[in-house]
Each structure stands twice: as structure tokens, then as C-alpha cells.
From Swiss-Prot:
GO molecular-function terms, A-Z: acetylcholine receptor inhibitor activity; ion channel regulator activity; toxin activity
Keywords: Amidation, Disulfide bond, Gamma-carboxyglutamic acid, Glycoprotein, Hydroxylation, Ion channel impairing toxin, Neurotoxin, Pyrrolidone carboxylic acid, Secreted, Toxin
Source organism of the structure: Conus achatinus (Little frog cone)
Propeptide: 1-11, 48-52
UniProt modified residues of type 4-hydroxyproline: P28, P33, P47
Chief place of localization: secreted
Coiled-coil regions, chain positions: none
Protein name: Conotoxin Ac4.3a
Length: 52
């Protein structure tokens, strides 16, 4: 069952990536930070935590 859970999580990740990629070239009419394409925004910005 662990493998199935992992597969589900992978699918969810892909869905998020696909939704994010819509504004990174596939849909020029949607503007968004370029770092959203490779998820570099999320790595720098940790919601709920302010330790800089």
C-alpha cells in the first residue's frame, strides 16, 4: 500500500506542476513569476515561517 500512496502523491505533484506551468509559456496571457515554473519560489518562500 505504500507504493500506491507514493503513486498518488506523485500524481498530485504532477497536477500542481501542470497547473503552474500554464502561466510559464503554455498560456502567454497568464502572467506569473518565472520561478514558479521550476518551483524555486516555494523553496525560497516557506509559508508560516519567517527565519531569514
Amino acid at each position: 500500500s505504500d507504493f500506491r500512496n507514493a503513486a498518488v502523491h506523485e500524481r498530485q505533484k504532477e497536477l500542481v506542476v501542470t497547473a503552474t506551468t500554464t502561466c510559464c509559456g503554455y498560456n502567454p496571457m497568464t502572467s506569473c513569476p518565472r520561478c514558479m515554473c521550476d518551483s524555486s519560489c516555494n523553496k525560497k518562500k516557506k509559508p508560516g515561517r519567517r527565519n531569514d
